[in-house]
Regions:
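Canonical leucine-rich repeat
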Residues: 66-69, 88, 109, 130, ...
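Short, solvent-exposed linear patches
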Residues: 71-75, 92-97, 113-118, 134-139, ...
Length: 370
C-alpha cells in the first residue's frame, strides 16, 4: 500500500510540474483572454495549453515581460508590438515564421535560432545592432526608428522589402539582395548607395541622407524615386522606364544641375518636384551646355512661357541682363543685353538653353521653341 501511494504521489508531482511560469500579470491576462489559461492570475499557465499554439497576438497589452514564451514551441506567428518589453527571448521558438515586436524598448534582439523567419518587424525600439545572418529565408525586414550604425545583409538574398528609415547607417550594401523590390533608407547618414545589382527594385526612397550621386539606370523596373534633401551633384534616371514612374521627387538638392532622364521633354512636363536650379537632360552633352560659365552665385530668375513660339520673358531681377541662347550643339544663336524680353520666333523648333547673367551671378535654363 505504501509503495502504491509513493507511485501515485510521483505521478501527481509530475502532473503538477507541467506548468509554465508567466511572471507578467498582463501577459497572463492576455493568455486568459485568449482561452489558454483560467482565472485567477496565479503566475503560471498549463504548458499543454500553449505548446501547440502556432499564432499568438498579444499586442498593446502593457506587457513588460514575455517570459514563458519559450514553451510556445510550435509558434509560427508572434505579434507583441506596442508593449513595454525591454528584452525578448525567442531562441526556443525555432518554428517562428513571422515576428512583430515593434513599439517596445528592446536594446537587443537575437533571432539567430529562428532560421524559418520570413518577416521581421522591429520598428521603434532602441536596437544598436541586429544580426540576421542566420535568417536566410527572410523576405521582409522593417527596422525603422532604431539606432543601427551598420547592417550585414550579405546572407539575405531572399529579401524583397527593406525598411531602415531613421537609423544611423553610414553605409548600406545591398549588392547581394537581388530580389529587392522596395527599399526605404530615409534619414540615415549614407554618403553613397549602389543599387546597380537590384534590377527588380520598383520603389526607392532615400531622402534625408548625404548622397552626392545616385545612378538608377540599371533599375529598369523602378517606378518610384524619392531622393529629397541629399547633397546630389549627379542623378542618372535613364532606366528606360521613366514614363511608368508614379513618384519622382528630387527637391532640396541645390547643387544638382543636371538630371539625366530618358526623355527630357517628357520629364519636364510630367515631373515637377525638382529644384529650380535643376534641369532634365538627355545626355552628357546637354549637361555640358548647362554648365557653361558655371558660377557659384546662381541668379534667381524665371522664364516664361515655356514652351514658346515667339517671345521669352524674364522676371525676378531688375539689374541689366546679358542673355545668350544656345542650341544643343553648344552654338550661341541669340545674344541680347539689357532686356527682359527676347524674340525667338526665328529659331527652329527644338530645345535650347538660355544663359541669363547680371554680371555677378547667372543661371542656365532649358526652354522649348514651338
Amino acid at each position: 500500500m505504501k509503495k502504491l501511494m509513493l507511485i501515485f504521489l510521483g505521478f501527481t508531482s509530475v502532473g503538477f510540474s507541467q506548468t509554465t511560469e508567466i511572471p507578467d500579470p498582463n501577459f497572463e491576462q492576455a493568455l486568459i483572454d485568449l482561452g489558454y489559461d483560467n482565472a485567477p492570475i496565479n503566475g503560471s499557465v498549463p504548458t499543454a495549453n500553449i505548446s501547440e499554439v502556432t499564432l499568438l497576438e498579444v499586442y498593446d497589452k502593457n506587457i513588460s515581460s514575455l517570459d514563458g514564451i519559450e514553451d510556445f514551441t510550435a509558434l509560427n506567428y508572434l505579434s507583441c508590438f506596442d508593449n513595454q518589453l525591454t528584452s525578448l527571448d525567442v531562441t526556443n521558438n525555432v518554428a517562428l515564421i513571422q515576428l512583430n515586436c515593434s513599439g517596445n524598448q528592446l536594446t537587443s534582439l537575437d533571432v539567430s535560432n529562428n532560421p524559418a523567419l520570413d518577416f521581421l518587424s522591429c520598428n521603434t525600439n532602441q536596437l544598436t545592432s541586429l544580426n540576421i545572418s542566420q535568417n536566410t529565408a527572410l523576405t521582409e525586414l522593417d527596422c525603422i526608428d532604431n539606432q543601427l550604425t551598420s547592417l550585414d545583409l550579405s546572407n539575405n538574398a531572399a529579401l524583397t522589402n527593406l525598411k531602415l528609415q531613421t537609423n544611423q547607417l553610414t553605409s548600406l550594401d545591398v549588392s547581394q539582395n537581388t530580389n529587392l523590390t522596395f527599399l526605404n533608407c530615409i534619414n540615415n547618414q549614407l554618403t553613397s548607395l549602389d543599387v546597380s545589382n537590384n534590377t527588380a527594385l520598383t520603389y526607392l526612397t532615400c531622402r534625408f541622407n548625404q548622397l552626392t550621386s545616385l545612378d538608377i539606370s540599371q533599375n529598369t523596373a523602378l517606378t518610384a524615386l524619392d531622393c529629397i534633401n541629399n547633397q546630389l551633384i549627379s542623378l542618372d534616371v535613364r532606366n528606360g522606364n521613366n514614363t511608368n514612374f508614379n513618384i519622382f521627387y528630387s527637391t532640396f538638392n541645390s547643387d544638382l544641375i543636371c538630371i539625366f532622364v530618358d526623355d527630357a521633354d517628357w520629364s519636364a512636363t510630367n515631373w515637377t518636384n525638382i529644384d529650380s536650379t535643376s534641369t532634365f537632360v538627355n545626355n552628357e552633352a546637354e549637361c555640358d551646355i548647362l554648365s557653361l560659365g558655371d558660377n557659384s552665385l546662381v541668379l534667381d530668375v524665371n522664364i516664361y512661357p515655356n514652351p514658346t513660339a515667339n517671345y521669352l520673358f524674364i522676371e525676378g531681377n531688375k539689374n541689366p541682363l546679358a542673355i545668350s541662347i544656345y542650341n544643343l550643339l553648344g552654338t550661341e544663336v541669340v545674344s541680347e543685353f539689357n532686356t527682359h524680353k527676347i524674340e525667338v520666333s526665328e529659331l527652329s523648333k527644338g530645345v535650347y538653353i538660355i544663359n541669363v547673367s547680371d554680371g555677378v551671378s547667372q543661371t542656365n535654363k532649358k526652354f522649348i521653341k514651338n
